[in-house]
Structure formats: structure tokens, C-alpha cells
């Protein structure tokens, strides 16, 4: 007996007499869904004579009609006829689905890179009565959605408007769902076609972690006027966007105009956009943009001082920050951000976390970034967008997805270091390419992306950001390599395997890191640095940023190497250079508060604390190597910068700074002036001055990962070191170029300390 026959019995009473028959009739339940939808386990909209799912799939749609009790004997025969009819239609449907699946499998086997799963032609005509359910809610138009595969392990469900997307894993859905409607239901998207009388348990609830009352309008949390909105947008362009690069500015300008018109009832027109086209955008897309607009307002206020906020907007900075942050949180909750396919909602969340990321308190950011990573995976940002052939994705969306994913990777690495954890995202977890080295004005909305992934050399709006992303990529590889080696060593010791020699393994890793760093340096030099002019502020910022990345690589490797093996693996020359640059970095950060030109980037600089550099200085001052007389000048300079840090940051009350200040205090106590008298060097160069010859390349690395990895094993053996003469200088600049790092550093500081130091602090 098939499932249809058994289903039909629920609506057919048995021809029995007596009390049991009365009980049977009392429990009788009316079936309103068609038998085909019941058998396929999909939601039926009860449309007559053919429901929408059956119409789209070209299936036979049959309903069970309840009969009066007096006609019970004849109803059994009717039910049997219905069952036999549906048995035949079910077999036809099975054959049809099998044919579809066979075609999909053939496409996937023969090369699914160009596979695009579209709905059947049947039932896709627009404007038909079946496109609207009985409650008056419009069902999704299949022509606005495509399901495209990249030829690897899944597909991307793309909507025509708003850049909405969902990642569809091939493991469960991509080859087994024959309609986009089915895919959306399998993914849990029940927003379309849901009946109006759904039970209370199915109604949307405020999502965790931003639980609270849901709101329909975010106007109470918006700025007072459209003029304030435009002023905050300009502040965002000036102070925040150069450090984040999350948006495409022409697209953002157009969307902001729509937002202002929608919120304040104005008729402002975007430059270069026809008014009719601008007004035709549905309001629901503006709702998805509102959290991003409020996040931009938050970031703009966050980048200003309290005095500037009061002067420009006649309000307290803390009050406006609380207002806009609450608006962002309510907007995220309203848009169901945990499951949303909207990339604008995810941009809002990432921008908010970027502004709130502080090296001295990464606990909240670290936790919420776990949500961000899962949201990005759900939207398929971890897959290279240009590999998905779809008419619903233009070049702007391709670049936006790349930028957003790699900003998430950057925050993941930074927060992981701040929490002493291994980065969550690994290189093998994604295929998304780095953003192209191209200006926003050269990306045209609606232009179809090509297979061309070439990123032209030169200096653009993206160059500084790309230099940082290349550095983060190299940092992550070094950290993961050291973690893998650490696990191997610990496992070998635990298993009693004496065939693994830690020093030899670390020396081999040293050679690997050297090769990795050299490749990165050559790429940066070829693609970007040779086109930079140190006389131009933003290009000088890129040069400063690039110069410190190599130092960061060796600093990370040093701190991730167990203490007992460091001196046997890393050469004294590299150790001295890294220590000198660490001191320069902390000196630079201490001077930043006095630089008025750096105020607009102070929100970004203040989120860095140089914990890694401070810990590096403290650890090296305790070694015999830097207690020798030939290092007296560098040692005195290091002690001076630690004392200046105590004076500058002594008022900090965060738990992390309490620990760091205590460590610095203990270090200064051990190295009191009575034990180590000051040298004439300090009289010549104050503690906060740049030191000629040592360079002033600085960056602000995140907090150190646990540097004292406990590794059991024998003492350091005198094994031959790699040929350290082959290790290139940590000064990245090619001496044949016009810009020489050592000789020009002080001149750059005098010309523009803002762009010089902000560049290196951008890491």
C-alpha cells in the first residue's frame, strides 16, 4: 500500500457502526494540501485547481474532497480511485525527477563549472494568477534567482537584486533538489509562501545575541536630518574607508541617496542615476541597507573626538555612539542577520566589529567573529565569485565579496592573536582571490565579470589595503606552520619518539619562512612599491606599511619559537634588527597622541597597543645577548621607551594593560639606572625621537600569541645553522629605487608624520 492510500484514509471514515464510529468521526481531520505536495513533503499553497508547486513542476495536482457521512460506503470507492490515479501520477513524477537528476549528474561529471540550475519553463510566466497565493502574498519569481556551480563542491543561489546569496553544499542539496524553490526550503528559507495563519511557535523571534523587542522602523535611531547623514558619510569617506575598504563608493553613494529619500521623504537624486530608476527600487531592499547606513554613522562618530562631535552635531559623542549602535543591533535583528542572504547586512556587522576591535579587549570581538565567519560561509563568500556563471552577479558584487571576505580574514587573525589562539580561517578553507588593484571608479555597476583575474600593477585606492592583506596572508601561514610543528614535537615527546629533533625542525622551518618572506617581498616590490612616490602622502603611507611587514614576519616567528631554541635558530643579526624595529614601533605609538594631523585615524591607532612589540623587548632584555657592552645604547633606548609607555598608558584600567604594566614595571626594576647607567646616547636622542640609521618602520601588531610554548626535549644542541648570510635585509626597499628606507625615514617623518606612521600602524 503506497503512502497516498494511507494518507487518504485520514479523510475517509470507516463504515463501522456503534460508539467506535462516533469516536472516529470526532477525531476526523480535514486535509487541505494536495496529495502530491504531501507525498513530496513540500509546502502547498492550496490553490485551486492546481497549486503553485505542482504547476511549476508540471505535476498532477489532486485534492481529497471530504464527503458527507451518509455517503460513507461510496466514499471508500472514491478514495480508491483517487489513490490509483495518484499512484500513476506518482510514478510519472518519479520518472521525471530521475531524468532531471540524471541530467544534473551528467553535467556535474562532465564539468559542472558552467552548470546553472534554472526552474522549468512551465509555470514561470509572470503575472499569472497562480503567482499569488490565496492570502494575497506574492510568491518568489523564479526568473530572479539562479543556482550556479563553480565546478568544485557546491553552488551559489543568487538573487537578482540586493546582492543576496546563499551557499548550497553539494553534499546535501546541489544535485538533489530539482527546483530553486526546493533548495530554499531545504536551506530553511520559509519566508516565501508561508501561510498567514502560521502557529505562534513559527513566528519570527528576536535573534540571539541581539535579543529584544523587534521594530519595524529604525528612524528613531537615525540622524536628525538628511544634512547630518551626508556630513557623516563624508566623514566616513575621509576617516574610516581608507582603513577598511569594505564598500564600493559609487554604489554606496547611490544607496545612500535612496536611504535618505526613504527615511526623510526627500527627492535627492544620485549623480549619474536616473530618477525613475532610483525611485523604482523596492523598499524592502532599503530595509536591508539601513543597518549598514547606521554602522557607517557609528564609524564616523567613532572616528571623531568628543569636542568635534559636540561642535559639528551639538550632541555628546557617547550618546550618539549608543544611539547608532542600538540602531545597528535592532536593524540586524529585524533583518534576521543570523540567516540573512543579504551582503549589506553582513557588511554592517563587520564594520561594527572593525570599529570595536581593540587589542586590549578582544574578548567580545573574538566571540562575535565566530558568527561572522559562519554568516560568510552561509553566503558563500569563501568561494571565488568569478567562478559562478550567473547574470545576477556583476563586477561590483565580485569585488565587494572579495573585500568583505578578506576583511573577515584580517579580523580573524587579529582577534586570534589577541586571544592567544590559532586563527580560525586557514588558506585551504577558501578559494576567494584577493581584491583587484583597481580604483572604485573603474568598477561599473552592471558590467558582467569575465574570467580575467589579472590585477594590474601600480598605485590605486586599493594598494595600501592589498599590501596589508598580503602581509596578513604571510603572517597566518607562519603562525599555522609553527602551530603544526609545535603539535608534532609535543606528540613525539608524548609517544616517546626520539627521532624528531626540535632544533633541526625549527631550522628547516626557518628556511621555509625565509623563502615565504622573500616571495612576498618580491611580489610587493614588483606590483606596488616601485610605483610609489614618497612625496605623495598616501603612497608614502604604503611604503611605510610595506617596510614593516617583513619585520612583523620575523617577529612572529621569533615569538612562536620556544625560548630554549631561539638563539640556536635565529641569527644575532636578525635578533638585533627585530629588537631595534620593535623599539622604534613603540616609540612611534607613544608619539601618536601628540600628532594633531593623525587625529582622523586615531580611532584605528588607538585600537592597537603594541603588546607583541613590548613583550618582545622585555624578553630580549632578559637575555645575556643584549646585556653585553656593545648593546648598551640599544638597551638604554629600550628601557627608555618602556618607561615612556608606563607614563603614557599607566592610566589604562583594562585587565590586559594591568598585566602589561606590571610586566614593564618588573623589567624596569630589574634594570634600574644604578645597575645600568644611562649612556651619552640618551642625551643626544630623547626617548621619543627617531634614531638615525635604525629606521622608523613601525606597525602595530596584535597582541602576542602565547610565546612561551612548553616543549619538552633535550637541551639545545650545537647543530649547524642555515646559511644566514642568505637571509635578505629586513629593509624591504630596493637600494636602486629613489626611496631609501634608512636614509629617508627621518625626512619622511618631518614631511608627514601622519601618513608615515599611520601607514605602518594600519596592520
UniProtKB/Swiss-Prot annotation:
Residue ranges, compositional bias (Pro residues): 197-209
Molecular-function annotations in GO: DNA binding; DNA-binding transcription factor activity, RNA polymerase II-specific; zinc ion binding
Annotated Low complexity bias: 1-20
Biased segments, Polar residues type: 80-89
Gene3D superfamilies: Zn(2)-C6 fungal-type DNA-binding domain
Summary of the knockout phenotype: Does not affect the production of hexadehydro-astechromein the laboratory conditions tested.
Residue stretches spanning the membrane: none
Pfam families, alphabetized: Fungal_trans (PF04082), Zn_clus (PF00172)
Main location: nucleus
InterPro entries linked: Sec_Metabolite_Reg (IPR050613), Transcription_factor_dom_fun (IPR007219), Zn2-C6_fun-type_DNA-bd_sf (IPR036864), Zn2Cys6_DnaBD (IPR001138)
CDD domains referenced in this protein's UniProt entry, alphabetically: fungal_TF_MHR, GAL4
GO CC term, one of those recorded: nucleus
Keywords: DNA-binding, Metal-binding, Nucleus, Transcription, Transcription regulation, Virulence, Zinc
Cysteines joined through disulfide linkages: none
DNA-binding region: 34-61
Entry superkingdom: Eukaryota
Induction trigger: The expression of the hexadehydro-astechrome cluster is induced by glucose.
Subcellular location: Nucleus
GO biological process: DNA-templated transcription
Role, per record: Transcription factor; part of the gene cluster that mediates the biosynthesis of hexadehydro-astechrome (HAS), a tryptophan-derived iron(III)-complex that acts as a virulence factor in infected mice. Does not regulate the expression of the HAS biosynthetic genes (at least under the growth conditions tested).
Protein name from the UniProt record: C6 finger domain transcription factor hasF
UniProt source species: Aspergillus fumigatus (strain CBS 144.89 / FGSC A1163 / CEA10) (Neosartorya fumigata)
Amino acid at each position: 500500500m503506497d503512502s497516498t492510500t494511507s494518507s487518504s484514509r485520514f479523510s475517509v471514515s470507516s463504515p463501522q457502526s456503534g460508539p467506535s464510529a462516533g469516536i472516529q468521526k470526532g477525531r476526523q481531520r480535514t486535509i487541505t494540501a494536495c496529495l502530491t505536495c504531501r507525498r513530496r513533503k513540500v509546502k502547498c499553497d492550496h490553490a485551486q485547481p492546481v497549486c503553485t508547486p505542482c504547476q511549476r513542476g508540471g505535476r498532477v495536482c489532486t485534492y481529497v474532497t471530504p464527503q458527507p457521512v451518509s455517503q460513507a460506503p461510496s466514499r471508500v470507492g472514491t478514495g480508491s480511485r483517487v489513490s490509483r490515479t495518484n499512484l500513476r501520477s506518482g510514478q510519472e513524477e518519479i520518472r521525471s525527477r530521475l531524468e532531471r537528476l540524471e541530467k544534473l549528474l551528467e553535467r556535474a561529471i562532465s564539468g559542472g563549472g558552467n552548470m546553472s540550475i534554472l526552474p522549468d519553463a512551465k509555470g514561470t510566466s509572470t503575472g499569472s494568477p497562480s503567482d499569488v497565493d490565496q492570502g494575497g502574498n506574492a510568491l518568489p519569481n523564479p526568473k530572479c534567482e539562479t543556482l550556479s556551480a563553480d565546478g568544485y563542491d557546491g553552488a551559489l543561489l543568487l538573487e537578482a537584486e540586493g546582492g543576496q546569496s546563499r551557499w548550497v553544499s553539494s553534499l546535501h542539496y546541489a544535485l538533489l533538489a530539482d527546483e530553486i524553490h526546493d533548495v530554499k526550503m531545504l536551506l530553511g528559507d520559509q519566508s516565501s509562501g508561508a501561510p498567514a495563519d502560521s502557529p505562534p511557535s513559527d513566528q519570527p523571534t528576536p535573534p540571539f545575541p541581539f535579543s529584544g523587542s523587534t521594530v519595524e522602523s529604525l528612524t528613531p535611531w537615525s540622524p536628525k536630518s538628511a544634512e547630518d547623514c551626508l556630513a557623516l558619510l563624508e566623514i566616513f569617506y575621509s576617516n574610516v574607508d581608507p582603513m577598511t575598504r569594505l564598500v564600493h563608493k559609487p554604489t554606496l553613494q547611490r544607496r545612500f541617496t535612496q536611504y535618505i529619500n526613504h527615511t526623510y521623504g526627500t527627492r535627492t537624486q544620485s549623480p549619474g542615476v536616473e530618477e525613475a530608476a532610483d525611485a523604482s527600487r523596492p523598499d524592502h531592499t532599503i530595509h536591508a541597507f539601513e543597518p549598514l547606513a547606521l554602522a557607517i554613522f557609528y564609524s564616523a562618530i567613532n572616528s571623531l573626538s568628543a569636542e568635534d562631535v559636540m561642535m559639528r552635531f551639538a550632541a555628546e559623542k557617547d550618546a550618539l555612539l549608543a544611539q547608532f549602535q542600538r540602531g545597528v543591533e535592532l536593524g540586524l535583528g529585524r533583518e534576521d542577520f543570523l540567516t540573512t542572504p543579504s551582503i549589506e547586512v553582513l557588511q554592517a556587522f563587520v564594520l561594527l566589529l572593525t570599529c570595536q576591535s581593540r587589542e586590549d579587549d578582544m574578548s567580545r570581538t573574538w566571540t562575535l567573529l565566530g558568527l561572522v565567519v559562519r554568516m560568510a560561509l552561509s553566503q558563500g563568500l569563501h568561494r571565488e565569485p568569478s567562478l559562478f556563471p550567473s547574470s545576477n552577479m556583476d563586477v561590483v558584487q565580485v569585488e565587494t565579496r572579495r573585500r568583505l571576505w578578506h576583511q573577515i580574514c584580517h579580523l580573524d587573525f587579529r582577534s586570534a592573536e589577541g586571544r592567544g589562539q590559532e586563527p580560525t580561517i586557514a588558506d585551504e578553507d577558501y578559494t576567494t582571490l584577493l581584491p583587484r588593484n583597481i580604483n572604485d571608479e573603474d568598477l561599473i555597476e552592471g558590467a558582467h565579470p569575465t574570467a580575467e583575474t589579472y590585477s594590474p600593477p601600480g598605485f590605486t585606492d586599493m594598494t595600501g589595503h592589498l599590501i596589508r592583506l598580503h602581509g596578513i596572508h604571510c603572517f597566518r601561514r607562519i603562525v599555522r606552520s609553527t602551530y603544526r610543528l609545535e603539535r608534532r614535537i609535543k606528540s613525539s615527546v608524548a609517544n616517546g619518539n626520539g627521532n624528531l629533533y626540535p632544533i633541526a625542525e625549527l631550522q628547516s622551518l626557518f628556511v621555509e619562512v625565509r623563502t615565504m618572506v622573500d616571495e612576498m617581498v618580491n611580489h610587493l616590490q614588483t606590483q606596488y612599491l616601485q610605483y610609489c612616490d614618497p612625496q605623495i602622502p598616501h603612497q608614502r603611507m604604503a611604503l611605510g606599511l610595506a617596510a614593516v611587514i617583513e619585520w612583523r614576519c620575523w617577529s612572529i616567528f621569533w615569538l612562536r619559537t620556544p625560548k630554549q631554541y631561539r638563539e640556536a635558530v635565529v641569527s644575532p643579526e636578525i635578533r638585533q634588527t627585530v629588537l631595534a624595529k620593535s623599539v622604534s614601533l613603540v616609540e612611534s605609538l607613544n608619539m601618536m597622541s601628540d600628532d594633531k594631523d593623525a587625529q582622523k585615524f586615531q580611532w584605528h591607532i588607538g585600537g592597537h597597543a603594541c603588546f607583541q612589540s613590548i613583550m618582545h623587548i622585555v624578553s630580549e632584555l632578559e637575555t645575556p645577548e643584549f646585556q653585553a657592552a656593545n648593546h648598551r645604547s640599544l638597551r638604554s633606548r629600550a628601557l627608555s621607551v618602556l618607561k615612556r609607555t608606563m607614563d603614557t598608558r599607566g592610566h589604562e584600567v583594562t585587565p590586559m594593560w594591568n598585566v602589561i604594566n606590571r610586566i614593564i614595571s618588573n623589567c624596569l626594576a630589574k634594570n634600574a639606572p644604578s645597575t645600568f647607567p644611562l649612556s651619552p646616547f640618551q642625551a643626544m636622542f630623547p626617548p621619543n625621537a627617531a634614531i638615525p640609521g635604525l629606521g622608523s618602520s613601525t606597525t602595530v601588531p596584535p597582541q602576542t600569541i602565547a610565546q612561551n610554548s612548553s616543549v619538552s626535549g633535550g637541551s639545545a644542541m650545537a647543530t649547524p645553522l642555515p646559511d644566514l648570510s642568505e637571509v635578505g635585509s629586513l629593509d624591504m626597499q630596493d637600494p636602486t629605487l629613489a626611496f631609501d628606507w634608512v636614509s629617508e625615514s627621518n625626512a619622511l617623518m618631518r614631511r608627514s608624520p601622519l601618513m608615515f606612521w599611520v601607514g605602518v600602524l594600519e596592520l
